[in-house]
């Protein structure tokens, strides 16, 4: 891409401070983004990247009051003197949670919403709606209700809804956070196709760096503590140690190369696993590292804790969300359940917790029939953390939310305070203990819900997407805490789209596709099986691609030994 003379987004000595905060969230930002560029903004939670995005689309200060100093020009418009309505004609925003962006009762109504507001003639409105729907490949679902769509389809509708205004800038706020790996890959491909078709400027805020880099980006803007720490081409940034030092996960294949003692340089093209250019000496070094690693040890059989036999369930008559699922979770295991959106993973957890009753099958916990027990009894032994934290939170303040279940048991207030504060420290929430929950980000709310379950000391914890919306620092903090809990005897089951989590933290992966259990194996074998990956909408790990590219004869073994 050739840079044009005038930037479409231009920050000059720009700072922003929320009215409720004592210090600026953004300090002295100088940044130019040019027409047609694709830019990734990365940084740890709370670094200011979402605030930066909010300044671009006008949410700050129009909806979130605060004081801005310096200059911000968006597509020739002075953003500091413009309304959010004026800026929306230039910037289209796709939110992290697409459910929060739906307005219409059908897909077609939702896409056409802004056109209706501008009193466009119906014939012209229908023509534009159909054209944009075709561009995002959702044209066969115009009569569907939003709740009938998958997560990836909802993202497409949200994108279409902002594209009808023919905006010059598309801003994506963590578009992959709630998507399975294959759908996330398709989303990045869609963004790539749309940008090539429309020459739109694309700004992406995302923690899943490796997934975004599936297609080229021009620059990565690294934000830390409200300042721009780096503004570099991906190959240049990935050759440094800046990502790890600032709480951001680098692509897994780069970690493997570093483990092998390989020096990364921009010339080796480290931003793509399938294009990385390693000289023969580096390839030899990687092979020697692989041969020196010991294969993982087999663990002895453990006592069964949760036993499921021939479990079937459907939300509507004649349709099965789960079909004849049988599995055993043993005491002290740390297990991942993976599969595409809508495969039946969350439904399985609802049946175990008693939120739904199965059509047929058995569920036993520690040898006892769970189907004879109510939800309250099951909750004494099984903790469940939902994917959407807003569906769990019922109190205004953080401390009160985490303390709620203990107070319901009549526990002494001093004992409650001690246990709650200990849990908040573990989850990285202690400094915010007296904050209102409304002031938290999506990822912080997620940690509140995890804390509210962990405080009860359950025998089995089921977590639905525990790391969604978390930066690498908080991801590692939560996962290391869960690993510590697991080492102390708590059984942990995680429903996840995060293949890194599955590889690094679990010894076993249960794969569900279209309501059926299709695999139950070690994660390395699951993520190196093309048949399983395709059927379950997973994505083969980049470690496998690196091993194949370097001619390692046993790519699956390479992945297993790396983990």
Where are each of the predicted segments found?
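The feature captures the beta-strand-to-loop junction immediately N-terminal to the Walker
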Residues: 42-44, 338-340
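Helix-to-loop junction immediately C-terminal to a conserved catalytic motif
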Residues: 57, 353
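Conserved ABC ATPase signature
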Residues: 145-149, 153, 436-440
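Catalytic Walker B motif of ABC-type/P-loop ATPase nucleotide-binding domains
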Residues: 170-173, 461-464
């Amino acid at each position: 891409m050739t840079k044009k003379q005038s930037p479409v987004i231009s920050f000059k000595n720009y700072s922003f401070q929320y009215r409720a905060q004592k210090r600026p969230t953004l300090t002295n930002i100088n940044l130019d983004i040019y027409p047609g560029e694709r830019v990734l903004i990365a940084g740890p939670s709370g670094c200011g990247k979402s605030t930066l995005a909010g300044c671009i689309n006008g949410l700050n200060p129009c909806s979130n009051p605060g004081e801005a100093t310096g200059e911000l020009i968006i597509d020739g418009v002075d953003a500091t003197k413009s309304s959010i309505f004026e800026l929306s004609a230039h910037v289209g925003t796709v939110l992290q949670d697409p459910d929060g962006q739906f307005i219409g009762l059908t897909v077609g109504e939702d896409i056409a919403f802004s056109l209706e507001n501008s009193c466009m003639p119906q014939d012209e409105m229908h023509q534009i709606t159909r054209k944009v729907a075709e561009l995002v490949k959702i044209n066969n679902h115009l009569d569907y209700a939003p709740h009938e769509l998958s997560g990836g389809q909802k993202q497409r509708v949200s994108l279409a809804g902002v594209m009808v205004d023919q905006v010059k800038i598309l801003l994506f706020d963590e578009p992959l956070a709630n998507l399975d790996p294959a759908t996330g890959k398709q989303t990045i491909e869609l963004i790539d196709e749309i940008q090539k078709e429309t020459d739109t400027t694309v700004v992406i805020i995302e923690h899943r760096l490796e997934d975004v880099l599936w297609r080229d980006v021009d620059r990565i803007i690294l934000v830390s503590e409200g300042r721009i720490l780096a503004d570099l081409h991906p190959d240049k940034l990935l050759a440094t140690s800046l990502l790890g030092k600032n709480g951001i996960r680098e692509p897994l294949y780069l970690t493997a190369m570093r483990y092998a003692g390989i020096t990364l340089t921009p010339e080796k093209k480290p931003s793509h696993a399938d294009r990385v250019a390693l000289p023969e000496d580096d390839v030899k070094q990687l092979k020697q590292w692989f041969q020196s690693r010991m294969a993982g040890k087999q663990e002895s059989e453990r006592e069964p804790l949760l036993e499921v036999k021939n479990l079937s369930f459907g939300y509507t008559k004649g349709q099965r969300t789960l079909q004849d699922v049988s599995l055993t979770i043993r005491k002290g295991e740390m297990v991942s359940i993976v599969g595409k959106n809508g495969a039946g993973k969350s439904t399985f957890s609802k049946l175990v917790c008693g939120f739904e009753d199965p059509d047929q099958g058995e569920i036993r916990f520690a040898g006892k029939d769970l189907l004879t027990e109510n939800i309250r009894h099951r909750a004494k032994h099984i903790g469940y953390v939902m994917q959407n934290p807003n569906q769990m939170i019922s109190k205004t303040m953080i401390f009160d939310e985490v303390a709620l279940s203990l107070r319901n048991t009549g526990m002494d207030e001093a004992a409650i305070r001690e246990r709650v504060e200990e849990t908040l420290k573990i989850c990285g929430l202690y400094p915010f203990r007296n904050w209102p929950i409304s002031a938290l980000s999506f990822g912080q709310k997620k940690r509140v819900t995890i804390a509210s379950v962990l405080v009860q000391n359950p025998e089995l914890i089921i977590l639905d997407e525990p790391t969604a919306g978390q930066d690498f620092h908080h991801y590692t903090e939560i996962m290391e805490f869960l690993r510590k809990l697991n080492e102390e005897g708590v059984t942990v089951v995680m429903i996840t789209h995060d293949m890194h989590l599955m590889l690094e933290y679990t010894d076993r992966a249960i794969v569900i596709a279209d309501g059926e259990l299709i695999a139950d194996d070690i994660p390395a074998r699951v993520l190196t099986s093309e048949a399983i990956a395709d059927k379950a909408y997973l994505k083969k790990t980049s470690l496998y691609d690196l091993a194949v590219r370097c001619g390692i004869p046993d790519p699956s073994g390479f992945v297993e030994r790396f983990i």
